[in-house]
Amino acid sequence: MEKLFSWESKKKGDGREIKSSVEEVGALLANELKEADKEIPLFIMGYSYSCYIAYDICKRFEQENIPIQGIIMIGGTPPTLRDDLMQFFSNDDNALLDYSRAKDLLNEELIATLSDEEKHEYLHELRMNTVAMVNYKFLDCKLKTPLCSIVGREDEPTIRNNQHLWNNYFQKVSFHQLPGGHVLITKYHAELAKLIMNYIELHV
């Protein structure tokens, strides 16, 4: 038996309060997940910025001795590379979009549907997420929960080639690469789903 819990960033027009830090979102979701059936194996998954939220939830659960079967990070930026990410998002909107198109870093299908104002809001949120990542404090010790790290073969070399740095934050890490860039979740979702299901089946 399986249950899926998901969290989506605030969108234009919804009335939710914006959470400005990884810790705020992690605390909110951790409290919700504690209400889940304890008999159901729990896996935490994050993409890009949400990888840090997944880590924060996992950290909180380990501190309270609540078991998690595994954590899955897709396109996660290791903590020591956060300044590089901040440098990228310090560009103006047009420069950021041009660079993204060349590197397949952002969701171009979504961006194409947005007005100029909505594009600015979208990029502003990405910048705020990046600031939240830079400000987040990781533990000095390694988490016990096994990590499955997944990146695209065409992702930013700085991210793709430094996934081994997650070994500094988890006792056990398995590394995987799939076709595509940073947004492989939109173009290679079938391959991604197969890899994730295989990982889950190995850890239940």
Predicted segments with their positions:
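Active-site catalytic motif of lipid deacylating hydrolases and related acyltransferases
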Residues: 1-42, 79-80, 84-99, 178-182, ...
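Charged catalytic carboxylate motif
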Residues: 28, 53, 191, 195
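Alpha/beta hydrolase fold serine-hydrolase catalytic domain that processes acyl esters and thioesters
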Residues: 59-204
